[in-house]
From Swiss-Prot:
Catalysed reaction equations from the record: 5-O-(1-carboxyvinyl)-3-phosphoshikimate = chorismate + phosphate
InterPro entries found in the cross-reference section: Chorismate_synth, Chorismate_synth_AroC_sf, Chorismate_synthase_CS
Membrane-spanning segments: none
Keywords, sorted A to Z: Amino-acid biosynthesis, Aromatic amino acid biosynthesis, FAD, Flavoprotein, FMN, Lyase, NADP
Organism whose genome encodes this protein: Geobacillus thermodenitrificans (strain NG80-2)
Residues reported in the UniProt entry to bind NADP(+): 39, 45
Subunit description: Homotetramer.
Associated pathway: Metabolic intermediate biosynthesis; chorismate biosynthesis; chorismate from D-erythrose 4-phosphate and phosphoenolpyruvate: step 7/7
UniProt remark on cofactor binding: Reduced FMN (FMNH(2)).
Cofactor: FMNH2
Name this polypeptide is given: Chorismate synthase
Length: 388
């Protein structure tokens, strides 16, 4: 399974082409729209979320509510495009006013300057339109399809916010993914700990008041993946490596860890590795899950636990210093409409990219063409693991 996306932040639409999704999977627009709505929520979002109400159009690969096995084409229209039709026109324009509106002041922390250097753009709108986090809309749409596939084979994915602006959730005594999802969906910052959630909102308010932005940490948990998914044979087949790459590919994400993560550097081995246990009912398992569900690039059968670190959004309403690429004069960076904190929304994006990588690994390992055969094969693998 793989996918490609296309489209600009203020262009007419965003498009995703999904290849390798097996035939026979029940899929409707409402499955995807539910995830798109979750992405648009979250305390600290900017005014654009009041403009856009994202809805998907499935324009290929699905008929009568089921996937065909052919590429799936998804389209999400940008409702704000009506205000950008001239400046984002595909054909050449003669409007001198619009031509002169080019972006020549790169924003610190963005792709603007590096992208202009790479592609030779003198108008950095050509960079910022594509590098915008708006592109994650269709990545969430692709992830929704992956989640639908995982649901069919008994695998659950859930995400939540662990930390925003130095405020960390301490109460994480949820008893199931159902409880975690229920509580976080009701939280404006997608935090399970209500006291921490309130302090997170206060931190966001303060950052907004100061014309600043703040980042945080999100966590994604995947339950139900059988042991042995992924591979130790080659570096590029390790599933944890693929998930790590997917996490840091999200806009503004700068770090990733599994299980106890970087804490492992501060502990002795006896407090890092997970003891192996066995029971007639479950077969082999682990006493703890410090490894976060992975050993040797393969799943252990324990829940996958992965965290991603998101830096503060670099678009600031009190801009940092920059230099105009045309005049070479120092200036304060240009301002695009932005959020003061996008960590809650980013947790939904993180769910999506993790779901896609897990689903792709499941399809690769347990059969590629039909969902019914994949379900049979994965159930056979679960029985084998219990009886091993």
């Amino acid at each position: 399974m793989r996918y490609l996306t296309a489209g600009e932040s203020h262009g007419p639409q965003l498009t995703a082409i999904l290849e390798g999704v097996p035939a026979g999977l029940e899929l409707r627009a409402e499955h995807i729209n539910k995830e798109l709505a979750r992405r648009q929520k979250g305390y600290g979002r900017g005014r654009r979320m009041q403009i856009e109400k994202d809805e998907v159009k499935i324009v290929g690969g699905v008929r009568h509510g089921k996937t065909l096995g052919s590429p799936i084409a998804l389209v999400v229209e940008n409702r704000d495009f009506q205000h950008w039709q001239t400046i984002m026109a595909v054909e050449p324009i003669d409007d001198e006013t619009e031509v002169k509106r080019k972006v020549t002041r790169p924003r610190p922390g963005h792709a603007d300057l590096n992208g202009a250097l790479k592609y030779g753009h003198r108008d950095m709108r050509n960079v910022l339109e594509r590098s915008s986090a708006r592109e994650t809309t269709v990545r969430v749409a692709a992830g929704a399809v992956a989640k639908r596939l995982l649901e069919e084979v008994g695998i659950r994915v859930a995400g939540h916010v662990l930390e925003i602006g130095g405020v960390r959730a301490e109460k994480l005594d949820y008893r199931s993914l159902d409880e975690l999802q229920k509580v976080t969906e009701e939280s404006p910052v997608r935090c399970f700990d209500p006291e921490a959630g309130q302090k997170m909102m206060e931190a966001i308010d303060l950052a907004k008041k100061n014309g600043d932005s703040i980042g945080g940490i999100v966590e994604v948990i995947v339950e139900g993946v059988p042991a042995g998914v992924g591979s130790y044979v080659h570096y590029d087949r390790k599933l944890d490596a693929k998930i790590a790459a997917a996490i840091v590919s999200i806009n503004a994400f700068k770090g990733v860890e599994f299980g106890i993560g970087f804490e492992a550097a501060r502990r002795p081995g006896s407090e890092v590795h997970d003891e192996i246990i066995w029971s007639p009912e479950q077969g082999f398992s682990r006493r703890t899950n410090r490894a976060g569900g992975f050993e040797g690039g393969m799943t252990t059968g324990m829940p996958i636990v992965v965290r991603g670190v998101m830096k503060p959004i670099p678009t600031l309403y009190k801009p940092l210093g920059s230099v105009d690429i045309d005049t070479k004069e120092p200036f304060t960076a240009s301002i695009e409409r932005s959020d003061s904190c996008a960590v809650p929304a980013a947790s939904v994006v993180a769910e999506a990219v993790v779901a896609w990588e897990v689903a792709a690994a499941i399809v690769e390992q347990f059969g590629q063409d039909r969902i019914d055969l994949i379900k049979e094969n994965i159930e056979r693998a679960r029985r084998y693991a219990r009886e091993f």
